[in-house]
From Swiss-Prot:
Domain comment quoted from the record: The Q motif is unique to and characteristic of the DEAD box family of RNA helicases and controls ATP binding and hydrolysis.
Pfam families assigned to the protein according to its UniProt record, in alphabetical order: CTE_SPB4, CTT_SPB4, DEAD, Helicase_C
Reaction it catalyzes: ATP + H2O = ADP + phosphate + H(+)
Organism of derivation: Drosophila melanogaster (Fruit fly)
Family per similarity comment: Belongs to the DEAD box helicase family. DDX55/SPB4 subfamily.
Upper lineage: Eukaryota, Metazoa, Ecdysozoa, Arthropoda, Hexapoda
Nucleotide-binding keyword on record: yes
Chain ranges for the short sequence motif DEAD box as given in the UniProt record: 173-176
Protein name in UniProt: Probable ATP-dependent RNA helicase DDX55 homolog
Amino acid sequence: MSRKKWSSLDKPPLSDAVLQVVQSFGFQQMTPVQTAAIPLLLARKDVSAEAVTGSGKTLAFLVPMLEILQRRHKETPWGPKEIGALVISPTRELARQISEVLAQFLEHEDLEHLNQQLIVGGNSIEEDIATLRRETPCILVCTPGRLEDLFQRKGDDLNLAAQVKSLEFLVLDEADRLLDLGFKTSVNNILGYLPRQRRTGLFSATQTTEVTDLIRAGLRNPVLVSVKEKASVNTPARLQNFYRIVEPELKFVALLEFLSSPATVIGKVMVFFPTCACVEYWAEALPPLLPKRTVLGIHGKMKNKRANVVEKFRNTPQAVLLCTDVLARGLDVPEIEWVVQWDPPSTASSFVHRVGRTARQGNEGNALVFLLPSEDAYVHFLKINQKVELTKLLTEEAEDADREKKKLPAVLDQLHRLQAADKGVYDKGMRAFVSHVRAYTKHECSAILRLKDLDLGKMATAYGLLQLPRMPELKNYQGGGYVAPAFEVDLSKLTYKNAQKEQVRQKKMETYEQTGSWPGQKQHKKRVESWDQTKKAKLDAKSKKELRKAKKQRKKAAEAEASRSGKGKKRQQFSQEDLDELASDIRLFKRLKKNKISEEDFDKAMGIEGNND
């Protein structure tokens, strides 16, 4: 699709205010998704747009939204209790980012009457309610959970359902992510409060069955728009995707070397890990080994700190952000030169979203995924599944591997000493490794990413663990890949640097020394049985086994006899004598269980030969 200039829109043309703000961003031409979606939305069509991440979807809905709200304001000014537009986003980071872009439009003097409010989890809901009661904003930018909560609130002198009766425009941003995060019910509930006479824009990086269902429920006769910068790829055109094969025990050293290299120091780097626990650990362990760069960590379980971390990442040159998939969608931070993935993500589509944090808005960018030797088939899998070509990172592999092997002992010593100096770091390391192993078992492409192919001892070495954790996956581990600390360490004497945690640990230690039981630890009580009960249980088990054996012998003998008499192909018929014998066997077994006959008498009656040792 050919690109058009923003000023070329003429059916209808953009207002001077909106056009001036867009041009102040430095954008002269529209991206393909903007070229396709904006005229349709301005023509009051419902639109479902699929476009690769980083393709300019935010302006594709903000621009027509502002134009539609202005038109209505000229006809009938917006009232003090009217909400004209809703923008629903899957995460608070993305919602906040949209709000920041929108704020730049609303600073224009001709758009000041279109005020907005950001409503996301993590903020005080009482403050949100107070603001909505005091001055209803024309535009709400929100996450679905908080918005649903406000719709359902009663008794707070707030009637949000009444305030959206004049709604003109609804945006469902990153719709596939909304559904992936389990917001399907919330979104459907929200749709039930909204008027049907509205325009809806649904934007998504992928079209799934769930998204199709949402389109049917929330859009009226929508126009479907599918825009890709290249028909043969699923990622931004100026993104270079690389991979590197590394041995499991060398993975952290390889990451450390990469983050220290001149190629990555010039810009920001995002490093994706599989779990929150992994981010927690490496955010503690990496900074001492990478002192020249600012290292930040963010994950989904962080509630109130996430906004501050993202803001610090934006404002810090050459920063390194360790994160989970909570930031795989929508985050638009300038100067991200590299996106690095510790290992393949749980789904192939997540790979596309992760690498889309760089090479945004037509800029260049790079992405690198570390693969183990057993994971090399992932390169072909990604090409078939997501149309993503991975190129091997051009390095002197033999020299790199040799250099990393030489650095491994020193790096491990630093990790070991970090954990030995603070039990908090030790705990985080253990949790990170266990969570990583568990996450690995849940890969979408488990046919090629198999847990049984991994040397878990070598993986534990990469984490610098002081010992291997107790977990089912390591129960029968026989490998010698794990490298223990070079110095002696008494794990029972590790202390927390956090004074409060250390105080709790010391109290538990005192209780343990007095009682022999660690406080809070689940006790597994063994059932106590008398000697007679134990003997009887063993006797019952043995008797049942012998009875099954005797019946099996009789059956074989009967089959052999039937075969000799030429009746083997007929269904076996039981005579009255056979039935009587079976009933006698059952009576004998019952008498044995009640101790009315001895085991020896039972064996003789059953014709079972004893074992002579």
